[in-house]
Amino acid sequence: KAGEFYTPHEVSLLMSEIVAYHLKDREKIQIYDPTSGSGSLLINIGKCAARYMGSDSKVRYYAQELKENTYNLTRMNLVMRGISADDIVTRNGDTLEEDWPYFEENDPVNTYDPLFVDAVVSNPPYSQAWNPTDKESNPRFSQYGLAPKGKADYAFLLHDLYHIRNDGIVTIVLPHGVLFRGGEEGTIRKNLIDHNNIDAIIGLPANIFFGTGIPTIIMVLRKNKQDSDVLVIDASKGFEKDGKTNKLRACDIKRIVDAYKERPEKIEKFARRVSRAEIIQNDYNLNIPRYVDSSEKAESWDIYASMFGGIPEAELQDLSAYWTAFPHLKAALFSPDNEAYCQLNVQNLKNAVLNHPDVVAFKTAFQNAFGDFDAYLKSALIDGMMRLNAAGEEERLSREIFARLAEIPLVDRYAAYQLLDDDWKKIAIDLEIIQTEGFAATKQVDPNMVLKKDAEVQDGWVGHVLPFELVQSVKMHEEVAALRAKETRLSEIAGEYESYLDELSEEDKEQNFVNDAKDAFVAAEVKKAIKAREVEPATMSILKDVDALFAEEKTLKKQVKDDSAALHQRTKGVIERLTDEEVRDLLHRKWILPLMENLNSLPDAVLDDFVKQLDAVCKKYETTFEDVESQITDTEHELLGLLDDLQGNEFDMKGIAELKKLLGGE
């Protein structure tokens, strides 16, 4: 993962989704990465295109890379992914110095034939130095200008733009400085806007790239756009932490891609379609915060409510989406003091919210929308597992979920999509196995190979598709329960040892039947002490109980070991003898039930968040400044009374007298 050639999978996937969508109606496509690195961008585009085209065999890949070892990695990765060598064209060279025309060596000028493709994708090195000398007439740069020699970002961008066909598309990762830096870059940016080439700008989260915290964007460019707007997306807030870096989640990628596809006028705090006239008004500055404000509202304090109490209507209005969804709830929870402030009039806020008819109706509507979704999934995934198109099935299911959520307020459809994607990862693997190896693969078990002392050895078995734990919980629950009971008893014995240790005196803990750390009994020494009969009766009673525990523990450990081995071996046999119907039931439990459980939890998550926000607003002004002042006064009076009872020498009493003055006493 060297930073100079590694593009995070999620960024690569995002760019690929945009490109694949643009090229979805084409029978064959050619794609080119002029700074190919490991080849991940090209590989992901092939996968995404397969969803629309039915096969990635209709894709021809072009790649150019400066560093020889990385160039070799590109070709190797493409071949290892099953891509035909006939569909791979790679070059080892400097993209900016050695453009990719085809020509005959003996007549390069008259036989010049530049490469034009359907899509160019790239993640070039950021702000790299280059040599613009004598390149003014180069066809890649002549219409737009030359990037400054200290920053080649726009040189790479113009190279990419030049190499697409008139109906092609470019996606390129760049440092965000290209959006607003002046000089030669400002000129190029102006020309790109005037030529109507910039289709979209996507601001990425900070620290998303390995080894650098440079803020980055993805710019989408086209040659023959029909509209002159630029879609600006601020995706900087959607991510999860992954060690020291930030990582786009599946829901973040889909939210961005959907915004690109739909090109909305505005999505609050996320995206906006910006006219060319507005960009010109801003002197061609494309800095994202000029067009999309994704900042969170700063918390403020209402001075009136802080002094006199009450809940400001203005702050309740911040929850307007909930009041719209639950039109009668607000009146049931609050009574007005005046036109601007109100009081909470229920004792238990959470119960009042959850039991209100509007909220009950909301949960019922969700249940109705997804009431038959389990059956829908069973029909699609279980009944149709051998014939469905696994590459496009997740997208089809996401459309179904979005359609069911269309009339359900408050539930974030992208949160639902994330649940689907989390589940889909295991489903997709299983489907690939079943479709390529046959349904019999579901009844297969494989040797569980582990590494021991630098050698691979077998340690039991694993289900090829069906996990042992799942099969045991469904088909062998009595045996599992018996084994778990013994394991539980072993845990209890460990706790009993600790209790008996606590009962010993410090003198007893110095005896040989307790170890040097004084945190465990020594089994052999316990037996000796019992036999010697040289301890107090109370201690003897403890030692006999401990000795009995040692015996019970030894027996249980052997039973657990033997039972576990027997259960494991029997599970292997159960999987191999499953009927087809039993397999389908187990797949339903593995694939569908967890997804349904997670989806059905979404309304509760919405309501929990609502109650949490509402409770915070109500408690914010529970104690007024007047209450605080009264508490301070009461405390001062109490302290004055205590001071009156104090006695001391002359100097102590003078000090106490002065303190009483400060506290408002005589």
Residue ranges and their predicted role:
Residues 97-98, 104-107, 111-461, 475-478, ...:
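A conserved structural/catalytic subdomain of Rossmann-like adenosyl-cofactor enzymes
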Residues 463-465, 471:
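Extended alpha-helical interaction scaffolds
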Residues 5-122, 127-129, 138-143, 148-150, ...:
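Conserved S-adenosyl-L-methionine
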Residues 4-5, 64, 246, 576:
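Helix-turn-helix-type domain boundary/helix-start signal
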